[in-house]
Regions:
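Generic recognition of flexible, low-complexity loop/linker segments
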Residues: 52, 228-231, 289
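Short, low-complexity cationic-aromatic patches
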Residues: 55-57, 97-102, 114-122, 234, ...
Length: 342
């Protein structure tokens, strides 16, 4: 039985199951599944990733899905305000479509057309060198379908050359680092983005760095912290930021949390233009971190799975040049265990 036939069979047996999970049960990547669907309900796309992203601006509203193994982040918005120079790119629309792109990870693109209970659904799906989905861009009822069709005509190709998938590079991480030096450099930061440089300089994972410094910089909290802080944010009505990412893409929500619904092990946020599904039992560690900036410290809640994957990161909404929200700091403070000086 070929992959496409098996896909149809499993999809019928598991209505509502994510393509990623069905591909996993077939022991193939999601990109390999898309490859198998070509000539049926998928088409290969060719061209520079930046050109395809730039062309997406013309279609207007889309629904974008960025996910990892444990969290799914869905945001409605348009591909305006693009900055796609070099290996890093930005789609910069706070409170709408807000993306951070690591373009050297982007490898293949497919157009997929599916029949659902709600009618036909069209998407453009981007995959990395390992065959995992980085970003899925869906047409909505408000998408300019004439512009969408023009984009497809420009980039779809008849060639479906074999995928050249690579294994994930095993991270080489430091087993010994000078805790006092790491802490000193952490306290000397003036911008949250300097944290990535600190990790790289010492060859550390985020969690390793957290374990090296004092509790006022990084403090482990209960794995139920996410549910607690979402409930607080919903009740208080302050704007928060929710980051979910993978190897090549991070999608950011900024706004008020309107509806939080736990369901079948998933913690969900349902807003009109934003949805989050996060597998709550996958949270193996939760950390509150404080990073110094020129505007005072910035506090985040960071969630990790047992395999070290960063599931999600949450911040209080903050505009550059302004101090962090007092309400967010209060909500974060309620997560800190009693007796911990943080």
């Amino acid at each position: 039985m070929n992959h496409y036939t098996r896909w149809l069979e499993l999809k019928e047996q598991n209505p509502g199951k994510y393509a990623r999970d069905i591909a996993g049960s077939m022991n193939i990547s999601e990109a390999e599944l898309a490859f198998a669907r070509v000539t049926h309900d998928a088409w290969r796309m060719r061209g520079d990733i930046r050109d395809i992203l730039a062309a997406l601006e013309s279609v207007g509203e889309t629904k974008c899905i960025c996910r990892n193994e444990y969290a799914v982040h869905e945001q409605v918005g348009a591909f305006t305000n693009q900055h796609l120079n070099g290996h890093a790119g930005l789609i910069l629309n706070p409170r709408a479509l807000d993306l951070r792109l690591f373009l050297n990870q982007w490898a293949s693109v497919f157009h997929i057309k599916e029949n659902t209970t709600r009618g036909e659904r069209q998407s453009i799906q981007f995959f990395d060198h390992q065959g995992d989905a980085l970003l899925k861009v869906y047409a909505t009822d408000n998408t300019d379908m004439a512009a969408w069709s023009e984009l497809l005509a420009r980039f779809i190709t008849d060639e479906n050359t074999p995928l050249e998938l690579k294994a994930v590079d095993a991270p080489v991480v430091q087993t010994r680092a000078d805790a006092s030096v790491v802490e000193q450099e952490w306290r000397a930061m003036t911008d949250v983005h300097q944290f990535f440089t600190l990790l790289k300089r010492h060859n550390l994972t985020r969690q390793q760095a957290f374990n090296l410094v004092a509790d006022d910089l990084a403090c482990k909290v209960s794995n139920s912290a996410l549910a607690q802080i979402l409930e607080s944010a919903q009740q208080d009505g302050n704007e928060i930021m929710v980051f979910v990412g993978n190897r090549g893409c991070v999608q950011i929500f900024t706004g008020v949390v309107e509806k939080v619904v736990p369901m079948k092990g998933w913690l969900n946020i349902f807003n009109p233009t934003f949805t989050l599904h996060l597998l709550e039992e996958s949270i193996a560690e939760a950390w509150v971190t404080r990073k110094p900036t020129s505007d005072g410290h910035v506090t985040s809640l960071e969630l990790f799975a047992h395999d070290g994957t960063q599931i999600a990161q949450l911040y209080g909404q903050r505009t550059e040049g302004e101090q962090e929200q007092a309400q967010w700091r209060k909500q974060i403070a309620s997560l800190i265990p009693e007796g911990v000086t943080a």
